[in-house]
Amino acid sequence: MTVAIKLAEAGYPVTVFEWKGKFGGLLQYGIPEFRLPKSFLERYQARMEEMGITIRTNTTIGSVLMIDELLRDGYSSIFIGTGAEKPRTLGLQGESLGNVLFGLNYLANPRGHKLGDTVAIIGMGNAAMDVARTALRNGSRHVTLYARSKNVTASSSEVSYTELDGAEFVFGMHIEKITDEGPVFRKAVFNEKDEIIGYEEEPVQIHADSTIISISQVPRRKLARTTEGLELTDRGLLEVDENYMTTRPGVFGAGDVVTGAKTVVHAVDGAKKAAAAMIRYMERDLTETN
């Protein structure tokens, strides 16, 4: 969104490819309505279209169309801002059970899932807080977040809001598997520095109508697999240089697909810098052509 607006303001014709049915990416499908009303995105889209920006929904780059085909068709520069929308799995028994969900999948369509009264959430990040608050707003009465250590990766304000909404927090719980009854943990043993030094032998079965895994998310690798010369880092992130250009000339990237899951503010900052770099690249290319 940010890159499209910056390029349009600079006078460039812009097309945005959205792989889902509604425009907005993570803002549309990963942030709850109570935090970001969908009407805001609708107004934003209308404003972008007024600026002359074309938005193509239900179009996946990397399967329906390829980056090479975009370059073939005359696009002077391409920006990849696909984010990190693939849920990270635990790799444990029970993740495929019918009463188990991943956080981002739930947030994309919370009213489409019947969680029941009791919900166990694995994770303590900002996304996990969104999941908990959304579940409470959609009828679940007992929502508990579980973490292995005593550290919380979510911001203190998000934790406070989640507590005010009625969620509970349990620390020192190492998940081993998930059953139809709910998650199974082993309690962690801490030393005086709150460091984990072991686990109790007896497993603890938690009874939950639904278990939601919300530990993190990572970028999908489809674009790298389908685009020659587009490389990833050891972490599976899009590799870019100091000007946000990828290893494929003319193709840029920023946001979670480059940094891993971070805040929207961080993604917007990177997008602004990437847009400026794209403009410099295209202006230089135009000068050399003339």
Region spans (language model):
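Beta1-alpha1 glycine-rich phosphate/pyrophosphate-binding loop at the start
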Residues: 1-61, 88, 126-170, 177-178, ...
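Generic beta-strand/beta-sheet core signal
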Residues: 17-19, 58, 80-82, 95, ...
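Feature captures the FAD/FMN-dependent oxidoreductase FAD-binding
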Residues: 42-93, 176-184, 210-212, 217-223
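Glycine-rich dinucleotide-binding loop and its adjacent helix/turn
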Residues: 46-64, 87-138, 232-243, 247
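FAD-site-proximal beta/loop scaffold in flavoenzymes
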Residues: 96-116, 193, 198-261
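A conserved FAD-binding loop/helix module that cradles the flavin
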Residues: 131, 257-286
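Active-site rim loops that border cofactor/substrate pockets in soluble metabolic enzymes
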Residues: 161, 180-195
